């Protein structure tokens, strides 16, 4: 039977499959056509993410059904230099004791009118 796979770019891929094919098998066919590794593919049908070990018939996918292909988000760690820069940017601030406005580290008075431009500032607490 024939099914369609629609990518986020709007491109539609046509695949020739059997209802007994597994989702793994379908992902392999997508890799053959598009070059996207199966571990980066997520297939969605009727609002559900399809699990690798299950078959097309498990999800009631019939001829000329359309699956949606979404790529997996890649995570990772932040470089130590970027982490230091981010913590410096976020932590080297002063905070108004009355209105909790974040201010530059060298500020002497609050910039907000609601606390009357008070001079009661404290350093922002450091993240642990």
From Swiss-Prot:
Family according to the record: In the N-terminal section; belongs to the ubiquitin family.
Pfam family, one: Ribosomal_L40e
Keyword field: Cytoplasm, Isopeptide bond, Nucleus, Ribonucleoprotein, Ribosomal protein, Ubl conjugation
Site of covalent link Glycyl lysine isopeptide (Gly-Lys) (interchain with K-? in acceptor proteins): 76
Matches recorded under InterPro entries: Ribosomal_eL40_dom, Ribosomal_eL40_sf, Ubiquitin-like_dom, Ubiquitin-like_domsf, Ubiquitin_CS, Ubiquitin_dom, Ubiquitin_ubiquitin-like
Further comment found in the protein's record: Ubiquitin is encoded by several different genes. UBI1 and UBI2 genes code for a single copy of ubiquitin fused to the ribosomal proteins eL40A and eL40B, respectively. UBI3 is a polyprotein with one copy of ubiquitin fused to ribosomal protein eS31. UBI4 is a polyprotein containing 5 exact head to tail repeats of ubiquitin.
GO terms for MF: protein tag activity; structural constituent of ribosome; ubiquitin protein ligase binding
Gene Ontology biological-process entries: cytoplasmic translation; modification-dependent protein catabolic process; protein ubiquitination; ribosomal large subunit assembly; ribosomal large subunit export from nucleus; ribosome biogenesis
Ranges where the Ubiquitin-like domain occurs: 1-76
Gene: RPL40A
Name recorded for this polypeptide: Ubiquitin-ribosomal protein eL40A fusion protein
Species, as recorded: Saccharomyces cerevisiae (strain ATCC 204508 / S288c) (Baker's yeast)
């Amino acid at each position: 039977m024939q099914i369609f796979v629609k990518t986020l770019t709007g491109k539609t891929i046509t695949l020739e499959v059997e209802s007994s094919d597994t989702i793994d098998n379908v992902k392999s066919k997508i890799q053959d056509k598009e070059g996207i590794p199966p571990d980066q593919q997520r297939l969605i049908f009727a609002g559900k993410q399809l699990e690798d070990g299950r078959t097309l018939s498990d999800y009631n996918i019939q001829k000329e059904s359309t699956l949606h292909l979404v790529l997996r988000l890649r995570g990772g760690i932040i470089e130590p230099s970027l982490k230091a820069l981010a913590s410096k940017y976020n932590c080297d601030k002063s905070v108004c004791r009355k209105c909790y406005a974040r201010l530059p580290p060298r500020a002497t008075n609050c910039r907000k009118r609601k606390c009357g431009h008070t001079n009661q500032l404290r350093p922002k607490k450091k993240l642990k």
